[in-house]
């Protein structure tokens, strides 16, 4: 499972001209599911993302997590995170999970956060064409992979 994690002052996701998810200060997470991913991959990334100390403390040092600041999280599915661009000019998505498997693990990821943590959780719409708007804070952008590829 892969994630692009961005620290934001605000973010929203629009489907067909309607904003369906909106957050203030927190994290925008673009989440991709790989064909070999399991619930343990989702659990690893939930724990990692929510506890990353990437928010400034009162001394300006990145020392606080999303949980510490009681920030919001916007989670958007993005299968293209598994695009392999090493050969040719068109990405191959053969390492992406099937839509059925990806949706199941995406929903598991989202529900784990909703049920176990007291933070605002917003989402995009799985499989839809979306417009994601954000105001980066920093910018701080991190790439995570549950298999620790990078």
Swiss-Prot record:
GO terms for molecular function: D-tyrosyl-tRNA(Tyr) deacylase activity; Gly-tRNA(Ala) deacylase activity; Ser(Gly)-tRNA(Ala) hydrolase activity; tRNA binding. The keyword Hydrolase applies. It catalyses: glycyl-tRNA(Ala) + H2O = tRNA(Ala) + glycine + H(+); a D-aminoacyl-tRNA + H2O = a tRNA + a D-alpha-amino acid + H(+). CDD domains: Dtyr_deacylase (cd00563). It is an enzyme of class 3 (hydrolase). GO terms for biological process: D-amino acid catabolic process. Keywords: Cytoplasm, Hydrolase, RNA-binding, tRNA-binding. It is found in: Cytoplasm. The keyword Ribonucleoprotein does not apply. It comes from the Bacteria. Pfam families: Tyr_Deacylase (PF02580). GO terms for cellular component: cytoplasm. Its EC number is 3.1.1.96. A motif (Gly-cisPro motif, important for rejection of L-amino acids) lies at residues 138-139. An aminoacyl-tRNA editing enzyme that deacylates mischarged D-aminoacyl-tRNAs. Also deacylates mischarged glycyl-tRNA(Ala), protecting cells against glycine mischarging by AlaRS. Acts via tRNA-based rather than protein-based catalysis; rejects L-amino acids rather than detecting D-amino acids in the active site. By recycling D-aminoacyl-tRNA to D-amino acids and free tRNA molecules, this enzyme counteracts the toxicity associated with the formation of D-aminoacyl-tRNA entities in vivo and helps enforce protein L-homochirality. HAMAP family: Deacylase_Dtd. Homodimer. NCBIfam families: D-aminoacyl-tRNA deacylase. This is D-aminoacyl-tRNA deacylase. It comes from Thermosipho melanesiensis (strain DSM 12029 / CIP 104789 / BI429). The lineage of its organism: Bacteria, Thermotogati, Thermotogota, Thermotogae, Thermotogales. The gene is dtd.
């Amino acid at each position: 499972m892969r994630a692009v994690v961005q620290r934001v002052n605000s973010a929203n996701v629009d489907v067909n001209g309607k904003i369906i998810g909106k957050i203030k200060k927190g994290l925008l997470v673009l989440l991709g599911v790989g064909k070999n991913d399991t619930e343990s991959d989702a659990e690893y990334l939930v724990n990692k993302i929510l506890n990353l100390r990437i928010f400034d403390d009162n001394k300006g040092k990145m020392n606080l997590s999303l949980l510490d600041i009681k920030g919001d999280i916007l989670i958007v599915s993005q299968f293209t995170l598994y695009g392999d661009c090493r050969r040719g000019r068109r990405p191959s998505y053969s390492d992406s999970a099937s839509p059925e498997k990806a949706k199941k693990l995406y929903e598991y990821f989202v529900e784990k956060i909703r049920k176990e943590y007291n933070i605002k959780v917003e989402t995009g719409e799985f499989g839809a064409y979306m417009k994601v708007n954000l105001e980066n804070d920093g910018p701080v952008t991190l790439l995570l992979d549950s298999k620790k590829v990078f």
